[in-house]
Amino acid sequence: RPPGFSPF
């Protein structure tokens, strides 16, 4: 996912 969330 986008930066600040999960790596995807």
From Swiss-Prot:
Q: Cite the entry's keywords alphabetically.
A: Amphibian defense peptide, G-protein coupled receptor impairing toxin, Secreted, Toxin, Vasoactive, Vasodilator
Q: Which GO terms describe its biological process?
A: defense response; vasodilation
| Subcellular compartments | Secreted
Assigned GO CC terms: extracellular region
Q: In which tissues is it expressed?
A: Expressed by the skin glands.
Q: Which GO terms describe its molecular function?
A: toxin activity
Primary residence: secreted
Family designation: Belongs to the bradykinin-related peptide family.
* UniProt function note: Produces in vitro relaxation of rat arterial smooth muscle and constriction of intestinal smooth muscle. May target bradykinin receptors (BDKRB).
- What is this protein identified as? Des-Arg9-bradykinin
Give the species this sequence originates from.
Phasmahyla jandaia (Jandaia leaf frog)
Write the lineage as a comma-separated list: Eukaryota, Metazoa, Chordata, Craniata, Vertebrata
